[in-house]
């Protein structure tokens, strides 16, 4: 049974990492081989599947991660992150700083992939937490929750956009309903969950994070740092750039010559590269910092995220083995005939696929193809089907998803602490989202 094989594989992975203390990347590759064999994959295709998984994962993330680490390091070394932190503290105060971080993360998350937003915001949140002597996780977990909600629920993110088409839903309606549902979901899974987690898992909130990609933390005099405006614009330029590109792309006609150019420069990799070039000027050249010192910062930022990239690639290998091994097809056949509510079916299928395959996007897209035929004409609002699927696709982030390893490494958590905080948070987020969708379904 494929589900049992996957469960055993996850248990072996946890044993290797927690008990044997084997390197996480090596553990992921070993388990990928074992699960592939258990699923009955052609032995000659196992290596190709693992290579495809690593390449596909890093092909999406390596460029963004690398350029993001460079950008973050340049802003950090120049004191830009410190300036942003101090300004936010002065404007919002200690009591309201968590709310400020959540709102900013939610707005930024609409335009950015979860991984990109995390890379950009982590250094700023770290600086704020350090200045206020707060637990890093106190601000970091609500920030990540807001990013995850927008990733799963709101266009123009790939999964919500693609499944809107599959269900025949109006994108504007999905965005409107999505924001209405995403706001209470973010509050419950972010700040409210944070209060619960701080009491139940205090050890996790004593961790100081692992921002090795940004190098050693420096001390700054405020009057020697860049201004707030230039620091904020430089840090968030990828967000601004991609948001503007998305808007222009929607306004231009499908056959417009400028549409392809706008979409090209609005991709995460291109936007991050342009943002890095801006940072080289605003945080380097304009501040009379030598190119030798700038080059040193860039080199150190890359060398110190190498292992994290390998771990994320290993997670991609595990995910690809599950896909190629037919786990998704097995789940599809299981749910093919059912009399449950289409909204609940869509959420359940997406949740099971997410647990098995890891990728929220793959889970959502696969679910759309399976659940669309279950909708009788006019029986359910297509926009709510999109949101139910999105809610299911973000449940219980664990070892087969890159986001799990990013949160673990950035926040400096143990495996157990990552399950207690991040995996539990994403489960709360998913169930809350489903509840909001079902309530909306009663009145629509």
UniProtKB/Swiss-Prot annotation:
The keyword Metal-binding does not apply. Keywords: Cell membrane, Membrane, Transmembrane, Transmembrane helix, Transport. The gene is yojA. The chain crosses the membrane at residues 2-22, 24-44, 52-72, 106-126, 134-154, 174-194, 228-248, 261-281, 305-325, 343-363, 377-397, 424-444. It is a multi-pass membrane protein. InterPro entries: Glcn_transporter (IPR003474). Belongs to the GntP permease family. Pfam families: GntP_permease (PF02447). This is Uncharacterized permease YojA. GO terms for biological process: gluconate transmembrane transport. It comes from Bacillus subtilis (strain 168). Its main location: membrane. The keyword Kinase does not apply. GO terms for molecular function: gluconate transmembrane transporter activity. GO terms for cellular component: plasma membrane. It is found in: Cell membrane.
